[in-house]
A protein has these predicted regions:
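Phosphate-binding beta-alpha-beta segment of Rossmann-like dinucleotide-binding domains, i.e.
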Residues: 73, 81-138, 302
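NAD(P)-dependent dehydrogenase/reductase Rossmann-like domain
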Residues: 273-391
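Rossmann-like adenosine-cofactor binding region
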Residues: 44-46, 168-259, 275
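Oxidoreductase and adenylate-handling cofactor-binding alpha/beta cores
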Residues: 89-108, 155-160, 286-299, 334-338, ...
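Glycine-rich Rossmann-fold phosphate-binding loop(s) that bind the pyrophosphate
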Residues: 144-145
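An N-terminal-biased, well-structured beta-alpha scaffold segment characteristic
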Residues: 1-80, 212-214, 218, 235, ...
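Hydrophobic Val/Ile/Leu positions in short beta-strands of Rossmann-like dinucleotide-binding domains
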Residues: 5-7, 141, 321
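N-terminal Rossmann-fold NAD(P) dinucleotide-binding loop
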Residues: 148-149
């Protein structure tokens, strides 16, 4: 079987080679592919084709994908966590250093000089750009995942005192965070004690406008705020008030909107955080591997809307089911198999929210019986999508 993949944006070709020979890359021409691979393409407001089974975002965020719509249609949405983490980490650390010494403004000033006495002008004017060192300053990191954890560790190595806040940090991630990073239980402590604050959390209804009037009201004067996560995490109206009051000395963001441009205390980058050759390659490779594993085996890794499910395929056939998370669904699946006198080699059912995912491995060589079972599932209530995979 050959799977069709539609790509959006410029996906690294080395990453696409991870798909292997069983995949046909149709660029953006296919009208009804099995999978999408994309970066920043906005899919909101679009209808998904009937064959579409998977969407892989070559990046960490999925705000450009209507995840709820995909879930309801039985489409698994993947991301590539950690693939661009080092790139974003370096961008944030560079931003801290740039803001501490005001290098960008200093460069603009120096480029405006002219004449034979430029060296003299430099010596006379450089005092206005005298900054501070970051050693012994306090950095507050909100979100200690793949990116935030790296920033916290390296900021400590640069001599900073580091506070970290993340009530949802995984055990695996926690093991990789330096013991010198002080974990705080209340985000207010980050606001109150930090000279620099950087945020690395997804945009949800709970995190939207994390930096609002109340948050800025807790901060000490002269705080630098760095946002390489999502623009909407900051209430811009409250930000302007904080800038005017001197609470925020500088705001550095990777998400430009017109109202933030040309402000002397705001530095806007054109979404460069994860845009390095290495990061784009890593994201493409991870996206390619993820799509290949899912399409060929049904296994799910790094999905945002379905649980991770991994199980080696040893039986002749595997049926994957995306179903609504309702009582007795596993019993109904088992009964349907039993009614056709088919032996179950292995079954895994895991849920996430209102939906669940089932891997059903069948020790049966009669393909007609397997097809009868597939037809039965496709006509069953609360089962959204059925796939048949042959070993």
């Amino acid at each position: 079987m050959v799977f069709s993949v539609k790509t959006f944006n410029n996906i690294n070709q080395i990453g696409l080679k991870e798909l292997g020979n069983a995949f046909q890359i149709d660029g953006d021409k296919s009208d009804n592919p099995d999978a999408y691979i994309l970066r920043s393409q906005n899919l909101h407001g679009q209808e998904f084709p009937s064959k579409l089974k998977a969407i892989a975002r070559a990046g960490a965020g999925t705000n450009n994908i209507p995840v709820d719509q995909a879930t309801a249609q039985g489409i698994v949405v993947f991301k590539t966590p950690g693939a661009n983490a080092n790139a974003v980490k370096e961008a944030v650390l560079a931003s801290i250093l740039l803001s501490a010494r005001d290098y960008i403004a200093a460069n603009s000033w120096a480029n405006g000089l002219s004449g034979d006495d430029v060296p003299k002008q430099v010596e006379a004017g450089k005092k206005q750009f005298a900054g501070t060192e970051i050693a012994e300053k306090t950095l507050g990191v909100i979100g200690l995942g793949a990116i935030g954890g790296r920033i916290a560790n390296d900021a400590y190595r640069l001599g900073m005192n580091v506070l970290g806040y993340d009530p949802y940090v995984s055990i695996e991630t926690a093991w990789n965070i330096s013991s010198h990073v002080k974990r705080v239980a209340d985000i207010k402590e980050i606001f109150e004690k930090s000279d620099y604050i950087t945020i690395h959390v997804p945009l949800t209804e709970d995190t939207r406008a994390t930096f609002d009037q109340e948050a800025f009201g807790l901060m000490q004067k002269g705080t630098t705020l760095i946002n390489f996560a999502r623009g909407e995490l900051v209430d811009n109206a409250a930000l302007f008030e904080a800038l005017e009051a001197g609470v925020i000395k500088r705001y550095i963001t990777d998400f430009g909107v017109d109202e933030l441009l040309r402000h002397p205390q705001i530095t806007v980058f054109p979404h460069l955080g994860g845009s390095t050759e290495e990061a784009e390659l890593n994201c493409a490779i991870m996206a390619g591997k993820t799509i290949r594993r899912f399409m060929e085996t049904g296994e799910i890794i790094n999905s945002v809307n379905f649980p991770n499910v991994r199980q080696a395929l040893s039986a002749p056939y595997r049926i994957t089911l995306i179903n609504k998370n309702v009582p007795n669904i596993v019993a109904r699946i088992s009964t349907a198999v039993s009614d056709l006198n088919i032996n179950i080699d292995n079954i895994i059912n895991r849920s996430k929210g209102d939906y669940a995912y089932t891997l059903l491995d069948l020790d049966e060589s009669d393909q007609s019986k397997i097809q009868d079972l597939v037809d039965k599932f496709e006509n069953s209530d609360n089962i959204v999508r059925v796939r048949l995979i042959k070993k």
